Swiss-Prot record:
Protein name in the entry: UPF0325 protein VP2321
Taxonomic source organism: Vibrio parahaemolyticus serotype O3:K6 (strain RIMD 2210633)
Coiled-coil features, chain-numbered ranges: none
Family of this protein: Belongs to the UPF0325 family.
Membrane-traversing stretches: none
InterPro entries given in the database record: UPF0325
Domain of life of the source: Bacteria
Length: 127
């Protein structure tokens, strides 16, 4: 029924609650969240990274200039189609987009702060 999700090792798609998709450098990161089971504090999730496909597009035919562009991996689009059938996501409003951008920014701040602290701790060990 869901061959691409099964290919990712997800054998019970009915347990999927939602998913998120974000871009990091030249990769798309898909995170799938499952329904929380009894006795669990947090819902389980799995993360998959897909490299973006690189294409050269002709920008100016007179000078034969090309521009390198990236686009979503074809396999990822097939997985997202299956996820949309399961989760039936609602239309996203402009306010929701703003909230998502702010949420992504806060997440990035935490990741960078954590990495800086880790590097500083490594430096302290060297003293």
């Amino acid at each position: 029924m869901y061959p691409h999700l099964t290919g990712l090792g997800i054998h019970d798609p009915k347990q999927i609650e939602r998913y998120s998709l974000r871009q990091e450098a030249h990769k798309d990161v898909l995170k799938i969240y499952f329904h929380k089971q009894k006795g669990e504090f947090f819902a389980k999730s799995v993360k998959f990274k897909y490299p973006r496909q690189v294409k050269n597009v002709l920008v100016d035919s007179g000078s034969h200039k090309y521009k390198e562009v990236t686009e979503i991996n074809r396999n990822l689009t097939l997985v997202i189609d299956e996820l949309n059938k399961i989760t039936k996501p609602a239309k996203v409003s402009e306010l929701d987009v703003k909230q998502k951008i702010l949420s992504d920014l806060r997440h990035l701040e935490k990741v960078v702060s954590s990495k800086i602290a880790e590097i500083e701790a490594d430096l302290e060990k060297l003293k």
